[in-house]
Regions:
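An N-terminal amphipathic alpha-helical segment
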Residues: 1-42
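Short, hydrophobic/π-rich interface segment
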Residues: 35-71
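Generic cytosolic/nucleocytoplasmic N-terminal low-complexity/intrinsically disordered segments
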Residues: 32, 44, 83-85
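Generic detector of low-complexity/intrinsically disordered segments
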Residues: 25-26, 58, 77, 81
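Intrinsically disordered, low-complexity regions enriched in serine, threonine, proline
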Residues: 18, 47, 51, 73, ...
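Generic N-terminal initiation segments characterized by hydrophobic and/or small/turn-forming residues
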Residues: 7-9, 20-21, 53, 72, ...
């Protein structure tokens, strides 16, 4: 995702989700959308939200997990958005 696309995506989801707006205002950075445990399609190897959170915490980040949205702003119930911030 190019930087301007990422900025547009973050503006879109922040406009509709107050929790995401609050995280951005607090200096959190969007990392990725990740599958919730058990939600990855069969046969697909993908890191779950728990694996992302664990790795980021081990790297010293404060981590938050929110609802995930696609590029059109539609809720993705099988995904979670991962956010990080250095304490």
């Amino acid at each position: 995702m190019a930087e301007t696309e990422k900025e547009a995506y973050l503006a879109l989801i922040a406009a509709q989700d107050p929790q995401i707006r609050a995280l951005l205002d607090q200096g959190f950075e969007f990392v990725t959308n990740a599958f919730k445990p058990g939600a990855a399609p069969s046969g697909m190897k993908a890191r779950t939200e728990r694996e992302h959170v664990r790795r980021l915490q081990q790297e010293g980040y404060q981590v938050e997990v929110t609802a995930a949205y696609d590029e059109q702003g539609q809720l993705r119930p099988t995904l979670s958005a991962i956010w990080r911030k250095k304490p």
